[in-house]
From Swiss-Prot:
Keyword Lipid biosynthesis attributed: no
SMART domains: HTH_XRE (SM00530)
Species this protein is from: Saccharolobus islandicus (strain M.14.25 / Kamchatka #1)
PROSITE patterns in alphabetical order: HTH_CROC1
Domain of life per record: Archaea
Pfam family, one: HTH_3
DNA-binding feature ranges: 136-155
This protein's name: Putative HTH-type transcriptional regulatory protein M1425_1284
Domain HTH cro/C1-type, chain residue ranges per copy: 125-180
Molecular functions per Gene Ontology: DNA binding; DNA-binding transcription factor activity
HAMAP family: HTH_type_cro_C1
Keywords: DNA-binding, Transcription, Transcription regulation
């Protein structure tokens, strides 16, 4: 984590009097979440001087999509007025771009591997076209694109090039231009299930995933933050599951940071304990704990029947 950029981010948040918490696990540079911002929806922030890894982006995507919010990667590699779309609900911005997001300013330009595009509000486009009496063919001809392209614009399946955006504004006005981050989040369908690493008898986490999925629960596996799993039941209740690791002090730090993450993402924290010493201490601290050989109690808790209360 870059000290210079993190200080910029904190200054921006404190200037706007936002409530936030720092996530300080794991304690090395490669982690997926640095800050959780408490706004209308929790926003995850990763601050990086370098390019973020696929694993970091994967964690950010899973948490953001499961909470229907945004993950922001703040880096000097991005231009001020352009957002890079890294994955579903994961957006990279410059420190200047981050300030605009926090100030509520609209950012409408974004970059993908296919080029630079402008975010449009598809529902406003369709409403204005129908209100003004234009057919899809009329608009396609005016823009110089296919009828299918107009269908895609109106369904929200495609955004537009700068050239097409200028013509749309001439025809319908600039209120059809959207915000890359928040308009994308609002229209995003929640994705819960995914392919998990194949069952491995040597890995406790792998066995746990297998048992949870076997009981009809939706699982997302995390690698570079304090929680190990996001679990959702059929009623869409969300749990963060954290597993004790080999080092006592690191485990205590992990649990503390996972508690912060759970609080800000409005999730319930469940801790899996692997030693008797840790079990007693965690129960004294008020954590909801389960022993590794008693996974059925954890499953009962999540499914709402006979869960053991700590």
């Amino acid at each position: 984590m870059s000290k210079k950029i993190i200080n910029e981010v904190i200054d921006i948040l404190e200037d706007k009097k936002y409530t936030y918490t720092m996530i300080e696990y794991p304690e090395h540079n490669r982690k997926s979440v640095d800050i959780v911002l408490n706004s209308k929806e929790p926003t995850l922030i990763r601050v990086s001087e370098d390019k973020v890894t696929k694993e970091e982006i994967s964690d950010l995507k899973k948490i953001a999509v499961s909470t229907l919010t945004a993950s922001l990667v703040v880096t000097n590699e991005e231009e001020e007025d352009i957002v890079s779309v890294k994955a579903d609900n994961v957006f990279a911005v410059s420190p200047e771009g981050f300030k605009k997001v926090i100030n509520g300013e609209k950012i409408f330009l974004y970059r993908t591997r296919g080029g630079i595009f402008i975010k449009i509000r598809n529902y406003i486009l369709k409403h204005k076209r129908e209100e003004m009496g234009y057919s899809i063919g009329d608009v396609a001809k005016f823009l110089g694109v296919s009828r299918k392209a107009i269908y895609d614009y109106e369904k929200g399946d495609s955004d537009v090039s700068l050239e097409v955006a200028e013509k749309l504004i001439d025809l319908f006005g600039d209120d059809i231009i959207g915000d890359v981050i928040w308009d994308s989040i609002k229209g995003k369908k929640e994705v819960i299930e995914e392919d998990i690493t194949e069952f491995s008898p040597e890995s406790f986490k792998s066995k746990l995933i297998y048992k949870l999925k076997e009981n009809g629960l939706n699982i997302l596996s995390l690698k570079l933050t304090a929680a190990d799993l996001i679990v959702k039941d059929n009623e869409n209740n969300r749990y963060l599951v954290t597993i004790e690791n080999k080092d006592y002090n690191k485990s205590m730090k992990k649990f503390y940071e996972a508690k912060k993450l759970a609080s800000y993402t409005k999730s319930e924290l469940l801790i899996i304990i692997r030693t008797s010493k840790m079990l007693k201490e965690c129960e004294d601290l008020g954590y909801k704990t389960y022993e590794e050989n008693d996974i059925h109690s954890l499953i009962d808790e999540i499914k709402g029947s006979n869960g053991r209360q700590s």
